Amino acid sequence: MKVLVIGGGIGGLSTTLALRRHGFDVDVVERDPAWGVYGVGIIQPGNALRALDSLGLAEACVESGAAIRGDRTWLADGETQIAAHDWPPLVPHLPPGNGLTRPKLHEILTSSTLASGADVRTGVTFSEIAPSDDHVDVAFTDEERRRYDLVVGADGLYSKVREHLFGPDLKPRYTGQVCWRYNLPRLEGLEEIWMFFGPDGSAGFVPLGQDLMYILTIETPIPEWRATIERDGAAAVYRRRLEPFAGPVAEVRDQITDDDAVVLRPIENIIVPAPWHRGRIVLVGDAAHGATPHCGQGAAQAIEDGIVLAEELARDVPVTEALDAFTARRYERCRAIVEGSEMVGKWEQDHSLPIDPDATRNAVIMTASAPI
């Protein structure tokens, strides 16, 4: 079987590696000529490490990152602790969780993909997809044309493959919050995710390496405020947003000085109705189910998608039957995670809502920890 994967990010490369491990012939196209990655760091919870372990990549991630043992929560004063959880490991020889820079994860995935024998072309994407009952003809922006048995849309939250399949009206929805991120030297004693909750949002730290962490802030902006800022002065804006926080957040606030290193994004999500395929074209990862960051499951679910899709295709059944089985295994799990993560964000915006954020997070964790 010959497969085209559109998108060279976490979901696309995980899918490629899983397919190659089952012996499928895979082409990858990535529209970014530099095949780079944007962002700061990423949380790999236990189920992400479990999935990466099945691809032979978990130990490389752990060696390049920082173990996460659990989470700790305080009020904005930095002194009043309100929660502490130690995470159990899902894989005996791996830590409960891991923090890693996005560039390092990208390096691990790209080098493994190239070593797998997949045909990777960068600076290229599709210009036309013409499906039929037994194949898909694809025209590319470099004027090549190729024929495939299956096309996988792994092109992220703003997926063009999704738009091709389902139309322009099915798109990510802004959930009312924004997220700031910035890399900093790691605080002494940071072995867990530390979060601090204030009246209008939260700030926290995630370990990424022996000497590195990132600070993140999830907040509800004023209605007329947009989740975009000018590069000049971005660090000063972020520092001002952190002024309500005392304790460790206040201690590191003045270290935020590099405008270009500030990452600010609107928090959006999407869940594409089942099934996630039309004929021989299927969506994976954020293209199908982009979650908000409140439960740290976005990348984990994308990796799981690739593993499950490869397993179903390896059963040697008709392609559409395998794709139906893929959606059947993935839809309810991903829906629960997307909706649960959004509920936590809703509670952060309005504490009067009848939502128990701890119970909601626990439900998401239980869903994600279950076998795939």
Regions found by a protein language model. Name each.
Residues 1-3, 45-166, 170-183, 222-225, ...:
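Conserved N-terminal helical subregion
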Residues 11, 34, 158:
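Conserved Rossmann-like nucleotide-cofactor binding loop
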Residues 33-51:
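Conserved N-terminal glycine-rich FAD pyrophosphate-binding loop of Rossmann-like flavoproteins
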Residues 182, 192-225, 235, 242-245, ...:
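Active-site substrate-recognition segment that forms the wall
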Residues 185-191, 224, 248, 315-316:
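Short helix-loop capping/hinge motifs at secondary-structure junctions, enriched
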